[in-house]
Amino acid sequence: MLTPQRSSYTLQFVTKIGKDDLLAEALLCEKTNFTINSVYLGKMICMTVHAVTMTKFTPDKAERAAHYNPQEHIYETCPGDEFYDACEYSLVGGGKLSTSHGRLSPTKTTPHPKSAGVTPPQRVPARPATRAAAPSATPTQPDCVAKQRTSPGVNSIKSGKSLAFSCTPKTPKTPWYGATHLFNKNVFCAAVSRVAAAHASDAASALWDLDPPKTNEDLDRFLKAAAIRILVCEGSKLLEMANATMERSPDGAAAVAPIGYDRRPRLASRRRSIKCKPPADDFFDDTDSR
């Protein structure tokens, strides 16, 4: 409870913010604006009352002093605090004070006609803008970012499950509708990509085995001369081949031995075995050791 001093005005009132009643106190000194400082849920609120009748306290008596009618309210908080709009002000001794619910603007003090003979407090220079009201240098992020919808069938493809075209419609000649077109297109592209990746890996392995480079110079010459064409013509077995490729290698590429040496069957190689002799400890070494 603020102790009233000589030539000062004090007011105790009850504010209603939302569903909670708040008991607040204010102190008006001479030559100052009438402001109410209250604490609500740990938040400091500084506001200017729209209209209030105050009582002047002197050592011997208390009498009605003035009735001020500022036109607007001022709400100020620290950064991160929420703004609370007071719905209703009620004086302890009776009577209600209404709010303007208006925009933020400097307070304007005008004397009430009944108290024209009383000199209202002089206005003080407006306080500089608080950090909460000052423009921020960093761009603010929107509270709700629009979530983009994924294309039909993409989530099923990314999950690593077996590829399958849409099961709707049921009959063979019924036209597709809705997202069936895009779903089947994405599944077809994923199946062709997996089969093509497997063919490309096999072709690259065969091309490397024809004449494997042994130096950086050989590697550079090999890369300039290498040309691989991939043909995907699995027909109605496209999904079956794509799913089989996925089971063999999750990334869709041909499986390679852990040691890095992938020995192909003799019939599939176009070089003489003497040019590329496998390591002595190779498991697939079938050369005559006698």
From Swiss-Prot:
* Organism, scientific name: Equine herpesvirus 4 (strain 1942) (EHV-4)
Q: Where is the composition biased (Low complexity)?
A: 118-142
Motif Nuclear localization signal located where?
A: 146-149
Could you tell me which InterPro entries the record lists for this protein?
Herpes_UL49
In Swiss-Prot or TrEMBL terms, this protein is called: Tegument protein VP22
Where in or outside the cell it occurs: the entry states:
Virion tegument; Host cytoplasm; Host nucleus; Host Golgi apparatus
* PTM info: Highly phosphorylated in the host cell. Packaging is selective for underphosphorylated forms.
Q: Where is this motif: Nuclear export signal?
A: 219-231
The protein's job, in short, is:
Tegument protein that plays different roles during the time course of infection. Participates in both the accumulation of viral mRNAs and viral protein translation at late time of infection. Modulates the RNase activity of the virion host shutoff protein UL41 probably to ensure necessary levels of key cellular mRNAs and proteins. Plays a role in microtubule reorganization that occurs after viral infection by stabilizing microtubule network.
Which cystines does this chain contain? none
Where do Polar residues bias regions lie? 98-112
> Keywords assigned by UniProt?
Host cytoplasm, Host Golgi apparatus, Host nucleus, Phosphoprotein, Virion, Virion tegument
